[in-house]
């Protein structure tokens, strides 16, 4: 918990919820105030004293703006506030909510990861394009605050009668890239206005491939958006001009985008463990495939992540098999810590049969509406809010079950990355039945119904507290949940499995060993062996792509036995003994195969001496070549030393 917090300021919101201050104090170990009824109205003096003390958290999040204003008036930091009313107190469930309130309190007072950010500067350069009339209307308004360029279709050039305060060009956008404060636009058929002369405006000759930059793009066209997941691209504002409210809102939003802003940084990337590519052969591209904004691109053996484009959905971190990508605002270690605290305080206060409900902002709104107008959440359903619910993958779901949660629900919304979430749920459910229940609820009054009618699970014989990387967490949790099983089949996109080797095709060239990004494939420096450690395999596909004999395939599975942690021999052969010194080298079958293909069949191996070179180790081969009649390192024959007699013998007068 936050060290400075020692007290809780409680309110029952005009008696609409039951708050037991004594029981809550016993469950949390914190001092609890008496239960007030109108902290935000009649008891503001109590709130001011609590803020002045600096050691009190207020159990009312709904009126946080009032509390922040009070803190500002007395020159104090804003107090810690959190909700126990909508998430716990307002419910038709007659069972005690003290364990749930204790868990929510303890979780709210945990130290949170630091949110990193960078400064983004916008000079207010705004490009507007789309319908001529709408573009000119928007440009006329925005030119008072921004540096505006209006892009019109070439056919609309004759409609320009007067231009004041902004630039007008004709053309078509070929492509665009970048993000807020740093967009780059490529135009075709670009024509600039010629300001001189009398009469109708004139335009320069059309130019293709012209490039320009801007800070803001206001898209008023009816064409496809310039960017994938365009609603997540900062600085790119798209509006339907047919809806006046949205059109006006877009103009207002664009007018505010000048100055210096903070852009959150979401992703931590460790290139050294990335399994994207090796030796120009493709391998894992999970993060590229799931990124909705196109922020992740291939860059040789690794990937590059553009922080300006990244919208922080977290899907890449969930599907990364090696842990090269981590979602910094909420890494798996933070989620596991929250699960542990919730369990500890919920069960410590006597709570039983806990359900976990993972949700985002949309889910929080549903919970609030359900609490006010419906049945609210049952007393054993503990909500946990995440900024990006796509980061809650199979490892987190399994860890929740292994730590004691009876059921785990993930509440999606209209902006959720459903494909990634369902893919992770498929893996989790293959390991443990219904480990992650993905639900979509549009009617808040129906929210409480999703927790009804579930068959009670058999009591877990043991619980665990998984820690470490996603792979380590998955293994520990899976062993806890499947104590009698060793091999669990998994779907095709799972990052766990075995390498299957066609022994007849494999020549033990070991090219797969040198390029395996996780070290799952290994060799024996003393003998021709191909070894494999299943627990380390990422199923990235690199070894299959690199194998010249197409001898490698995969089996998607999770091996929970200890054998998965050890190196097993996929193939081994007898080494070849040098015919000169007897030292072992190479693979006997390969050497014999080479001799069979070359001896007497190739000009360089037409005699037995040349063939013997293949059967020698490196040292003996060099020695034999050096002393051979056909030594490639030898110089030409040295000429005989000439004497006086040689010269005189050639004279005619001699």
Question: Model-flagged regions — what are they?
Answer:
Residues 300-339, 409, 416-419, 423-426, ...:
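Terminal amphipathic helices with adjacent charged low-complexity linkers/tails
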Residues 74, 233-235, 371-374, 423-427, ...:
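Short secondary-structure boundary/capping segments
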Residues 38-44, 303, 389-393, 530:
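Short acidic loop-to-helix transition motifs that present clustered carboxylates
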Residues 2-3, 272, 315-411, 549-654:
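Flanking helices and flexible, charged tails adjoining ferredoxin-like Fe-S electron-transfer domains
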Residues 302-313, 501-506, 529-539, 567-568, ...:
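Flexible gly/pro/ser-rich segments immediately N-terminal to CXXCH heme-c attachment motifs
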Residues 1-290, 294, 353-366, 410, ...:
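Ferredoxin-type iron-sulfur electron-transfer modules and their immediate structural context
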Residues 111, 141, 344-345, 372, ...:
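A generic secondary-structure signal
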Residues 290-323, 511, 515-518, 527-546:
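Basic (Lys/Arg-enriched) interaction patch that binds polyanionic ligands
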């Amino acid at each position: 918990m936050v060290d400075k917090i020692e007290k809780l300021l409680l309110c029952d919101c005009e008696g609409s919820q039951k708050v037991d201050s004594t029981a809550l104090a016993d469950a949390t170990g914190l001092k609890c105030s008496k239960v007030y009824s109108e902290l935000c109205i009649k008891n503001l003096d109590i709130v001011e004293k609590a803020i002045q003390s600096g050691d009190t958290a207020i159990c009312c999040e709904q009126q946080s703006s009032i509390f922040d204003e009070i803190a500002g008036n007395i020159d104090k930091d804003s107090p810690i506030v959190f909700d126990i009313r909508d998430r716990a107190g307002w419910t038709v469930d007659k069972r005690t909510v003290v364990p749930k309130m204790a868990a929510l309190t303890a979780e709210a007072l945990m130290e949170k990861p630091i949110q990193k950010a960078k400064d983004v500067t916008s000079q207010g350069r705004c490009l507007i394009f789309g319908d001529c009339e709408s573009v000119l209307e928007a440009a006329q308004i925005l030119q008072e605050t921004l540096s505006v360029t209006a892009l019109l279709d070439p056919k609309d050039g004759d409609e320009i009668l007067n231009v004041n305060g902004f630039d007008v060009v004709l053309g078509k956008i070929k492509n665009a890239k970048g993000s807020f404060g740093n967009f780059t636009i490529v135009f075709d058929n670009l024509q600039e206005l010629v300001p001189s002369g009398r009469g109708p405006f004139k335009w320069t000759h059309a130019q293709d491939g012209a490039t320009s930059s801007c800070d803001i793009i206001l898209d008023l066209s009816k064409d496809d958006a310039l960017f994938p997941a365009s609603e997540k691209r900062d600085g790119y504002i798209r509006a339907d001009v047919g809806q006046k409210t949205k059109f006006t809102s877009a103009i207002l939003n664009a007018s505010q985008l000048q100055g210096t802003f903070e852009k959150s940084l979401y992703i931590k990337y460790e290139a050294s463990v990335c399994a994207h590519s090796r030796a120009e052969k493709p391998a894992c591209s999970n993060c590229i495939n799931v990124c909705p904004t196109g922020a992740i691109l291939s860059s040789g053996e690794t990937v590059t992540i553009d922080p300006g484009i990244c919208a922080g959905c977290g899907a890449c971190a969930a599907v990364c098999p090696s842990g090269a990508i981590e979602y910094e605002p909420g890494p798996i270690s933070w989620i596991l810590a929250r699960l542990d605290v919730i369990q500890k305080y919920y069960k410590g206060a006597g709570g039983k049969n806990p359900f976990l409900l993972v949700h985002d902002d949309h889910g929080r709104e549903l919970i609030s509406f359900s609490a006010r107008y419906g049945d609210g959440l049952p007393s054993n359903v503990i909500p946990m809010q995440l900024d990006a619910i796509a980061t809650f993958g199979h490892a987190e779901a399994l860890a929740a079950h292994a730590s004691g949660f009876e059921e785990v629900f993930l509440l999606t919304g209209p902006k959720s990355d459903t494909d990634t979430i369902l893919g992770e749920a498929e893996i989790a459910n293959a390991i443990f039945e219904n480990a992650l229940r993905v639900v979509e609820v549009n009617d808040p009054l129906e929210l409480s119904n999703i927790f009804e009618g579930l068959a009670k699970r058999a009591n877990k014989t043991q619980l665990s507290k998984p820690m470490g990387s996603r792979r380590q967490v998955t293994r520990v949790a899976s062993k806890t949940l499947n104590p009698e099983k060793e091999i669990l089949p998994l779907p095709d996109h799972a990052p766990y499995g075995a390498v299957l080797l066609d022994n007849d095709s494999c020549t033990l060239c070991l090219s797969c060993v040198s390029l395996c990004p996780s070290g799952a494939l290994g060799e024996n420096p003393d003998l021709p062996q191909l070894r494999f450690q299943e627990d380390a395999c990422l199923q990235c596909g690199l070894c299959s792509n690199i194998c010249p004999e197409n001898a490698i395939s995969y089996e998607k599975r999770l091996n929970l036995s200890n054998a998965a942690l050890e190196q097993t021999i996929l193939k081994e052969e007898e080494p070849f003994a040098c015919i000169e010194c007897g030292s072992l080298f190479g693979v006997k079958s390969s050497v014999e195969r080479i001799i069979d293909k070359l001896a007497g069949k190739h000009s360089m191996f037409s005699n037995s001496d040349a063939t013997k070179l293949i059967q020698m180790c490196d040292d003996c081969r060099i020695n034999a070549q050096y002393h051979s009649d056909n030594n490639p390192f030898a110089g030409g024959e040295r000429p005989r030393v000439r004497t006086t007699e040689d010269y005189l013998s050639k004279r005619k007068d001699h």
